[in-house]
A protein has these predicted regions:
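Juxtamembrane intracellular "pre-TM" segments in multi-pass secondary transporters
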Residues: 1-2, 175-206
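Helix-loop boundary and gating motifs at the non-cytosolic
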Residues: 2-48, 199-206, 210-238
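Helix-loop junctions at membrane interfaces in 12-TM secondary transporters
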Residues: 3-5, 87-99, 281-292
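Helix-to-loop junctions at the C-terminal end of transmembrane segments
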Residues: 53-67, 150, 248-262, 347-348
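Structural signature of the two symmetry-related core transmembrane helices
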Residues: 70-84, 264-279
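Multi-pass alpha-helical transporter architecture, strongest
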Residues: 87, 165-177, 359-386
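Cytoplasmic helix-loop-helix junction between adjacent transmembrane helices
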Residues: 100-134
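A membrane-interface helix-boundary motif in multi-pass transporters
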Residues: 148-164, 344-365
């Protein structure tokens, strides 16, 4: 790898390593802290809900700064002490306040980082998928390591994640500097992102699929460890299998994107997620749940690679940070808020997290049926002919 691509890959590895610790075990941290029922749902939903505000604001700020890297450094730097504070909290009120503050910074790291990396790779022969591969490998290894190190002491999770974020801050310092456009004004500003070619149907499909993924990321750890024999260390293996399953697509994803485009590839995601969540709703064995994780490689990573590359190609330079923020706002903030609330309500009413996965089957099937006629009729959406 050339030096800029190597620095970008290092950032990806550190970010997804930190995210493996936080995202994979936050629900177990809350559960071990005595939080359950509606209070657990409120804590889990506050994070994506507040990111609906924070992500577009930081995306806009990044585009207006002389150096776009500064916004990334601020969001990573602020997240570290907030995670440490979360580790000190004992009661629900303190956790709720810190979680809300954390949501103003940490969810913005991924879209800001993606925007900088995609811009850095424009003149590089190294495709984005190869760089993103470092993130999947790191997520797999760190998930396994975190599961083994935490054991049943999930209260230690914030400290472990904060340590990973400290390393990530160093990785962010090494990213190639990218100039913002503080004096460029585009009529309509941030809202112009929604007027980019085919942005609305693509974002609509992503929102539905990410709603289902939001339920998975929030409740899978609780569901898995509730199965007979579903230990914390085995949960780490589940995350490892899921991350490893992303590798084939990341090796081929750039070529597949150019050939089939974002819309058609995400229809494959819709079909795979319908099957995946249908199986998760039915199985009662942790070994079967481990096997189902092999379908993970056709879900999140396909959506994010396709949307990141498409928006990077069609957005003007002064809107690139905002464009990535919109992807994250729609695909994370809005959709995961729905996934956590609706899925949590159903699982609470029926007394089973598996029932929530049944609802997500309906969401993914609706996405597939509703958007297949749209994207199969349109030309290939790869940003070159849009």
């Amino acid at each position: 790898m050339k030096k800029p691509a190597l620095r970008c890959a290092l950032f990806m590895a550190l970010y997804y390593g930190a995210n493996a610790v936080y995202q994979g075990y936050i629900s177990k941290f809350y559960q071990q802290s005595g939080i359950s029922g509606s209070r657990l749902i409120l804590l889990l939903v506050s994070f994506p809900l507040l990111s609906i505000l924070s992500q577009p604001l930081w995306g806009w700020a990044s585009d207006r700064m002389p150096r776009r890297n500064v916004a990334l450094l601020i969001t990573v730097g602020a997240s570290i002490p907030l995670l440490c504070l979360l580790g000190l909290m004992k009661g629900y009120a303190g956790m709720a306040i810190v979680s809300c503050l954390f949501a103003l910074f940490y969810p913005c790291v991924q879209p800001l980082g993606d925007s900088l990396i995609l811009q850095s790779l424009q003149e590089s022969p190294i495709p984005y998928g190869r760089v993103r591969l470092a993130g999947s490998v790191s997520y797999a290894l760190c998930s396994l390591a975190a599961g083994a190190l935490l054991g049943r002491n999930y209260r230690a999770m914030p400290w472990m994640a904060a340590g990973m974020l400290a390393l990530l801050f160093g990785g962010a310092l090494l990213l190639p500097p990218q100039a913002g456009r503080p004096h460029t004004r585009i009529r309509g500003g941030f809202w112009q992102v929604f007027r980019l070619p085919h942005a609305l149907p693509l974002l609509g499909l992503v929102m539905l699929l990410q709603a289902a993924m939001g339920y998975f990321y929030s409740y899978f750890a609780l569901h898995f460890t509730s199965l007979n024999g579903g230990r914390g260390a085995l949960l780490g293996w589940a995350y490892l299998i899921g991350s490893a399953s992303e590798i084939p697509f990341l090796l081929l994803g750039d070529r597949l994107f150019d050939r089939f485009g974002a819309g058609r590839l995400m229809l494959v995601s819709a079909a795979a997620l319908t099957l995946r969540f249908g199986l998760l709703a039915l199985v009662r064995s942790p070994i079967a749940a481990l096997a189902i994780q092999a379908l993970h490689g056709l879900g999140f990573v396909v959506m994010m690679l396709c949307m990141a590359k498409y928006m990077s190609r069609v957005a003007p330079p002064a809107l690139r940070g905002s464009a990535q923020a919109v992807i994250s706002m729609a695909g994370y903030g809005i959709s995961r808020t729905f996934g956590v609330l609706a899925g949590g309500f159903i699982s609470n009413r029926l007394g089973s997290i598996g029932a929530g996965f049944g609802l997500m089957v309906a969401v993914c099937a609706l996405a597939l049926i509703g958007f297949a006629p749209v994207f199969l009729r349109l030309p290939v959406l790869n940003g070159k002919n849009s």
